[in-house]
Structure formats: C-alpha cells, structure tokens
Amino acid sequence: KSVLIYNMQKYYLLLIISISAILFNCAGRKIDLEEELSINFNKALKFFNNGKYVRAKDEFQYIIMTDPGSKIANESQYYKAEALFFMKEYEDSWDAFDQYIRFTNDIEKVEKSRFRICECAIASTNIYQRDQKQTIRAVEQLQMFLEDFPNSYLIQDAENAIIELRNKLAKKDFEVGRLYLKLEEYESALIYFRSVLNNYYDTNFADDARIGVMFTHILNDNRKGAKNYYKAEKNRFINTQKGLEAKALINETEEGLSLSHYFQLYK
C-alpha cells in the first residue's frame, strides 16, 4: 500500500512539473510573440509615417492575422484603415474602419474613424452629371455622425460637407430641369425645378430654380403664370441680385424673350 501511495505521489509530482513546464513554455512563446509583433508594429508605423502606405498596410495586416483579437492587432486595424484611406481605396478603408469600431473601446479613435467613414463616402461620390446615390449615402453618413457626436470638434467640417453635397444634389436636379426646358418638356422641367425648391431650398440653386420656373411659364406662353409666381416668391429670394434678375425677367419680356434671355437660358 505504501508503495502504491509513493507511486501516485511521484506521478502527480511529475504531472505538476510537466504542466508547469508547458505553461512556462507557452508564456515564453507569448512574450516572444508580443516582442516580435511590437517590432513589426513599429516598422509598420515607420512605413506609414513616411507615406509608404502599401508597405504599412501589409505589415499591419500581418500583425492582425498573427495575433487576432489582441490589443496590438486592434491598433494595427486602425492604421491599416488609415493606410487604405491614403491609398484612395475608399470602400476597403470604410470596411476596415467599421471592423475597428466593433472591437475597440477607444472613444477618441471611434469618433475619428466614424468621420473617416464619412470622408470615404464623400470621396466615393460622382460628379453631378452622374448617378447621385453615393452622394445621398454620404449625406446620410454625415447626418448620423452629427447625431452621434454632437460635441465633436469635427462638427463644422461635417456641416460644411453636408452643404457642399446638398448643393451637388440641387445642381443635379436644376440641370435636369434646364435640359427639359430646352427640350420644351415644360411639365418635366417644372417637376425638377420644384424638386430643388422642395428638397434643397437652402442651397445656392434655390433662386436659380425660381427663375427656372418663371422661364418655363414664359416659354410655355403663360406670362400670367410667370408674373403670379414672381409675386408669390419675390420675398423668398436668398440672393438680392437673383431677385433683381427675376424682376427684370418679368419687366423685359412683355414682347417675348430677347437674345440675351435665350443666352441666359442656354449658357
């Protein structure tokens, strides 16, 4: 019996020693990995700061794949997203920032990342002549940013970006209205001019849309409609010069449009 007890004690002692050795070895490897990745991170950060964004992105990606979920991997995810942004890979950058936001507790970087997502959306928009779905998406992202970070130091930048994007959307509708006007599709022209006034009344194109409505009535042999519209809208012109231009359009077209008016229409 004593021999059996001795053997069991010996077995458990060996087991404890083996487990301790394994744990010590694992801990050592963990420390070695952390040291290795710290070196990689500093190397990647140096590439990033020197504007070598492709090299930086690859190095940060290596860290993310080698030790996923770690603090250094999460920090690498942020800089990978930044590198992609500067590489003008805006959709990939958006995805990378979104991934970073999900797993970080750094509120300051969350705010910066959310605004970067807005910038990615803005950079993905088309010129006004093309489809404007991306512009609408960018406005929505900026509005969500304003709601989520009402005290952000980036508020003014976000508001200015919204103004610029809304002007682009207004210009799109205004130019479509002008096109229909030139094609003598008067009802369609009015739809687009009114869209500017209903949806983008605070933009630079609102006054132009009012004048566009007046032009439409005049070209459609409806001077009375043009005069009544001017009377109803004359105090709503944002720009004084545009208001005077509208008044002159009524006063100078009793006998029809002159060459200068057609130039104004088709310029």
Regions found by a protein language model. Give the residues of each.
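Sec-dependent bacterial lipoprotein signal peptides
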Residues: 1-26
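Acidic, polar-rich low-complexity tracts and alpha-helical solenoid repeat scaffolds
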Residues: 9, 23-267
